[in-house]
Amino acid sequence: MHSPSRRAIALPALVGIITSATLQQPSLPRSPSAVILAAEQAIASRRAAAVRQDWLGRLRRDPSNRLARLGIASFARLAYDYAAADSFIAPLLTRSGARPDSIAAWARIETALSAGQQWRIRDADSLFALAASEGTAARDGSAEGGALTRLALIRGRTQGVEAGLRLLDSATRVLPTNDIANRALALAYRAQLVLARGTPGAGPLADSALILARRANAARVEGIAYNVLGREQYRVRRPDSAEVLFGLAVRRLKDAGDLVGYAGALQWRGYLLRSRGELGAAERDLRAGLAVGTIAGQLTLGWTEMNLGYVAMALNDWGEARRHLAASRVLLDSARDRWGSATAMTAEASVRWAVRDWAGADSLLRDAETQLAQSGNTSQVLDTRVQRLRYALARRDWPRATEMLALARDTTMRGRSAAYVDLDYYDALLALGTGRPNDARKALDRSQREAARAGEPPTYLQLARRAEAEALLGRLDTAEASLRAAMARFERYRASRETREQRLAALGYAGDENDPDVGVATVVAALARAGHTTSAFDFSERTKARELLDGMARREALRDPSTDRPEAREAALTKVYTRPITLAELQAALPESTAVVHFNTGTWNEPTTAFVLTRDGTSAYIVPPADSLVDPVRRLVLGLQAKNDARPQARALGAVLAAPIASALGAGVSRLVIVPAAPFNTLPFDVLELPDGRRMIERFEISYAPSASVYAALRRRSLGTDGDTPVRAAAGARGVLAFGAPERPRQSGLARWDTLPPLPEAAAEAREVARTAPRSLARLGRDASEAALKRMSLSDVSVLHFASHAVVDPAGLRGTALLLSPGGGEDGIVRPEELSALSIDADLVVLSACATAVSGGHAGDEGLRGLVAPLIESGARGVAATLWAVDDQAQRLLVRRFYQRLARGEPTAAALRSAKLEALRGGAAPRDWAALVLWGDPLTRPLVTGQLSQSPATAARPH
């Protein structure tokens, strides 16, 4: 948490930044309001050093010069040197019982401004009120009106918009007509409050404030007006104009030395960039605002922390989001900022929703709406109602959704409009959910017409939902065209993201209508029902493992000698879109006896489609919606983990998922490659029961692939085929490299590290697997380090084995890592991006750790937010990983049997099946054998002796 005290900028430092000693030194203004404005102007025009030096000289020559003292105090406050400001201002304040004059009233305003900058809100409120009364007593309309103007913004946040507007009415009545700067400030603050209230007129008010501010040469007020205009342009769906205006606000407030306003403008621009998906630029602005806000005050810090929370949510990093939002709530509550506190509650509701705490999310939104309504912030009330509407739609609570849509429309119809809220789109969602696709199509027409009037092209969501409506109406050609346009638009958006993390975030499942694959499942199912299997499969495949497929393509391209040229290398590194495999191409690539089972699921009760593909044909089956299978899958997995009798759940899910597969396949198919979709990413298909009572593992070898395209690419990596068996050239020694029982780092930065249990069998397991093949090595304890992993040559390793802990955060990449020993300049925490940067040429990587294959529930079909995907991208042809934490001894036994069969030359999937069947027939519970699953090519033979050279081992030699 940030301390409420703020580090001051030393006056010499400020002078060094904005000095201009060669300019003519001005005279001291004759009124206190003009003195304070002159100090602000001197900073904005970079004459602060000369002006302050002149005023200090006047005070030294005449210690009774109260105007010079007031000006020097103002310079100190503007430099955030509050101690110096207080020492200069104290002699100017009215003594008890004395009649105040104008200078005393403005001195009181200075103390209030100082308190406000430090966000001591109660002190600032009472001091501005006292200053207003002192201005009245001194018959100084500028002091009275100036104090009331500044008090109005505080009261607007703490007592409601109407209270603030009433104070501005009073201020306007007493401000002299020639006090242009304070009149401009009053207009700018009125524009802010009107914008919050949601009624029209904020833009013209801000324009008028800008005109007066320019006349008064008041850079700070100019910046405030630009900021309001930017917010107004964002409200009416003109984000490009808003970005320009926020940029002007940032520049003018920085020039004015107003760090509070500067940080606020950075926060607003960061908010805009975040809403446009420009997460890298947004985070840069927000972190810059946070740094400035550390000096400027708690209000800015609170809002900036909140927006950093939103950035973390956009990256599906819910833990990071919670941390920022908790800090935001503390800061905003301590500042009594009711708007900010309520907005932070709505953000926290988003996190609660993401982790399926629906009751908690709704409770927070109700409280936030009440608080915002009491404060008169109708614009944010509308936003909160729309958020409640979205959640009601996602829960299929049609009565609540209808109620919230009506309330939102009522808010806009009473003139309190936030034009950026597309209620027609939500009307379409409600119509789709209640079985009225034609009404949905009409609502989408209205939505797109409104967007066209604003100069915007159709959004991905509009196009995808139109495809869904057309599919439900049986207009399949139109549905295909609309979905194709939606996907093309989304891929352009994804390609524009700056980093892998941002591209993955764009693909992340948000749990509501922001899911990037909305509507796809409905269209796929409609096409499959109509017999358009090829089109249905092609659309489904385009939703899967896009970032992983692109990463693999980039890695392959870099191996091409032509990429030695800088321009070719740059093109390979920046390539984003790789064409997925077609149905015909996949069938041609399938080995004998192999079937691919490809699932497509949706949200909002959309149907699930299962494609079963062999060399000879394709069939498609419609199974229950994924929404109805989330809880059965969870109950089965939890039952397996607890060693409960999960046969009833395995039988029930088998009837839904396994039976159609078995009925579609003849006896000649013995190998399944499953391409899962949420919620099946964590489901061990091995344990599902077939109609004849057998488990699937008893009939099939089962492996998994993130997508059909990734599976085909991994087959190509195997260098060719001889029947069903990949053939590898024996290029040097190829053996097993095992890492086991690494030391724990003293400080991991991962909260869950300290809770992980010891792995007493890990060292023995690593030694044992290293003995299954010649030319192998086990690195244990301190030697099982991240530094060794990164520095060794891994191209000569056929099997890379990790008997160590891992932390997999299903909600985000930042909390996911493989844990090795620290040392050699490395912390021992190997994160996904570090794994994907390795150069691996292994047939198999084994992650014999806890839940290393877990895919985030928020990751949708992109899935695999664990450690599997980065290892595949780095060059592995197969990855064996665990779905849940397994007993250490049971895991060692299963791994031993697995390696024994690999050493006999069995293909990877067959070897794993044999090891599992031995455990099953020996009476082991499914918990002890079903967790370990294989992702990738099932046919590699990593330990075929004939493939191993007799030359000395090099796999373990550091480079």
Question: Model regions: which residues?
Answer:
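TPR/Sel1-like alpha-solenoid repeat signature
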Residues: 72-76, 108-115, 127, 144-155, ...
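Amphipathic alpha-helical segments of tetratricopeptide repeats
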Residues: 93-94, 132-136, 169-175, 207-214, ...
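Alpha-helical solenoid repeat scaffolds used for protein-protein interaction
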Residues: 307, 330, 346-353, 357-359, ...
